[in-house]
Amino acid sequence: SEVIAKHLESLGITVTRNVGVNGVVGILEGKNKGKVVALRSDMDALPITENNNLNYQSVNDGVMHACGHDSHMSILMATAEILSKNNDFNGTVKFIFQGAEEGPPPGEEGGARMMIKEGVLENPEVDAIFGLHISSLLPMNKVFYKPKGFFASSSRFTVKVIGSQSHGGTPWLGVDPIVISSQIINSFQTIISRESNLTNEPAVISFGIIEGGNRFNIIPNEVNLVGTIRSLDYEMRDYIKQRMIELAEGIAKSYGGTAIVDIVDGADITYNDPELMEQMLPSLKSSAGKNNVILNSAKTIAEDYAYYLNEIPGFMFELGGYNICLLYTSPSPRD
């Protein structure tokens, strides 16, 4: 963030540091008074060791920009440089460089919500906000957009399955939380495939962590399941959460065990303002080329940029970054 702050200051842009922990905000005033527009980039990396020999390889062991946030920063820094040298425009541009888009450390605040809480959309008050996300799945130099719901909401869930420990040779003397967990995992998938009308909006339940046991011949006392829910409809999300609790508790009870379900909502649905998007499409087509601006479908990835859109009009688009010479998609240690 200090590199960004110094770059903005070198351009004559007024800079505020440490917004939302380590965020940077720059303000550039145009020639005349007018609307205030915010441009936002995320900054955080992922806990992945970079495995390539590129000249922009991470210099920090175990951490890399595997999700493209380094390109977001570079693009916004270049935009600030261009506008600072050609500030013959009406209004004010606010450059927002935000940390913790991937989520703050457990038990801490951060990301877009904390930036908003600390007044990033005030002084001066922002009229509209714009952002982008690069995609390694989409063709390079193409811009993809969609009005209304664009990216999904994200919720993190944990299911603690409690049984009764026993020896692997005498499983009838205990309650096996691994068997219970396997039934819960399968049942959650039927919420999506058999109970959700996916012709309206997509939804996903994915497990990322299964933890349990410490020896091959001992059935553990408990198993922890951790995963994510993605949805583009709040009613559907609420239904999915309700059914997850009902199924987990019911299945565990039927086997003589217990299931404790905890669900924490993360990013909201990224909702692109249709009217503002319609106003901005001519500019996008003018800069990227008419045939390079493409209406696309919604995605089940999530972005805490959604919290800005809960406060003011704005939109986010995707920028294609697929390299036909590299058969990797983000996040990848070779990306």
Name each model feature, range by range.
Residues 1-65, 74-90:
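Acidic/His- and Gly-rich active-site-bordering loop/insert found
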Residues 39, 69, 115, 167, ...:
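Divalent metal-coordination and catalytic microenvironments
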Residues 54-64, 71, 89-209, 214-218, ...:
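Histidine/acidic-residue-rich, glycine-tolerant segments that coordinate divalent metal ions
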Residues 186-193, 262, 267-323:
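Active-site-adjacent substrate-binding region
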Residues 218-240:
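A conserved active-site cap/scaffold subdomain adjacent to cofactor or substrate pockets
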Residues 240-247:
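Short amphipathic alpha-helices in soluble, non-transmembrane regions
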Residues 328-335:
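Conserved small/polar residues in nucleotide/adenosyl-binding loops
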